[in-house]
């Protein structure tokens, strides 16, 4: 089994556990209560001659920890100053050491 297969298998297992704890109806109910401003991803990419999607991640299965003193907000600001059109923020916890908190933190400054 390669790493990608392992990640998929692990993620499916975690999703099954989560689904057993919270119903789809409850998730939909929670999501509809959130006040999330929508962005236009396609327009962000189309607005420039060369669009760059910058990736924010602490680690990867192949490289291990990439940034020891990782701060997703600092990285987002850095990428923005370099002209990134959009951000890809890894939230997968086991292999990329991500967190959904990264999304919330970066959303506050973008």
Regions found by a protein language model. Name each.
Residues 1-49:
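N-terminal positively charged helical leader segments and presequences
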Residues 7, 54, 79:
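Residue-level signature of catalytic and energy-coupling elements of molecular machines
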Residues 36-53, 97-110:
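Alpha-helix-loop-beta-strand connector modules within alpha/beta enzyme cores
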Residues 52-56, 87-89:
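Hydrophobic faces of well-ordered beta-strands that scaffold small-molecule active sites
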Residues 56-71:
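Active-site mouth loops of central-metabolism enzymes
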Residues 58-60, 91-95:
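Active-site-proximal loop/turn and secondary-structure-junction residues that shape catalytic pockets
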Residues 68-90, 109:
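Alpha/beta enzyme core
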